[in-house]
């Protein structure tokens, strides 16, 4: 999209295991002087309405607790059932709610890696009696083969100033979530990561918690 916004999320496919979210790469606009934004709109780009709303509300709430007003897109944007929002409508809402920055996150890709682990031989202890040896047949047996599947969900998050005419990219980051479990847990981890990084980049004030 030509026009700039801030933070989007897509439904995370769920797999078993413990989710871990890490920042893969980030860039900050060198011309950004650290001016504080007052009202930040959070937009999650997902076809799943519930996941999108959960993400927007969670991030907006955490931004607000940092002393900056966070506004969830789900609270001010009436989205069509299919297709993107009209850019003129977005501009009107941004002006109406006096928003000066937007956070947008989008799903980049989902990768699933399957690793095959062949059976591994191990040596049995030596038995010097018939009963100890009987049933082992050979002094070497094999552990069973098995497969391990790892899923990685990559999300891009951009922060834009929306001052006229079209705004400016302030910060962009790419995060990887490994073996995501429930969407709720992934959202919580992603939100925490985003806020922590925005504090580090002096886009948000540091937490007093």
Where in this protein do the model-derived segments appear?
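N-terminal segment of the mature soluble domain
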Residues: 39-41, 45-114
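Surface-exposed short loop/turn segments
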Residues: 84-158
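Acidic/polar residues at beta-strand termini and the immediately following turn/coil
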Residues: 53, 57, 128, 161-163
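C-terminal/domain-edge helix-coil "capping" segments
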Residues: 18-38, 47, 135-209
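Residues that line or immediately flank small-molecule/substrate-binding pockets and catalytic motifs
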Residues: 8, 106-109, 177
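Sec-dependent N-terminal signal peptides
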Residues: 4-12
């Amino acid at each position: 999209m030509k026009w700039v916004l801030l933070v989007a999320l897509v439904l995370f496919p769920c797999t078993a295991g413990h989710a871990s979210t890490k920042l893969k790469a980030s860039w900050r606009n060198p011309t950004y002087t650290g001016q504080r934004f007052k009202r930040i709109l959070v937009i999650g780009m997902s076809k799943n309405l519930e996941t999108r709303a959960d993400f927007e509300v969670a991030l907006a709430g955490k931004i607000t607790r940092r002393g900056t007003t966070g506004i969830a897109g789900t609270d001010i944007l009436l989205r069509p059932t299919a297709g993107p929002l009209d850019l003129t409508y977005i501009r009107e809402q941004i002006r109406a709610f006096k928003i000066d920055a937007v956070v947008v996150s989008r799903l980049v890709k989902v990768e699933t890696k399957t690793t095959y682990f062949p059976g591994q031989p191990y040596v049995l202890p030596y038995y010097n009696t018939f009963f100890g040896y009987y049933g082992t047949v050979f002094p070497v047996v094999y552990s069973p083969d098995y497969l391990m599947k790892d899923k990685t969900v990559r999300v891009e998050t951009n922060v834009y100033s929306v001052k006229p005419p079209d705004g400016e990219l302030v910060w962009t980051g790419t995060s990887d979530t490994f073996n995501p479990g429930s969407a709720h847990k992934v959202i919580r981890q992603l939100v925490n990561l985003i806020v922590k990084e925005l504090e580090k980049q002096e886009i948000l004030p540091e937490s007093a918690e």
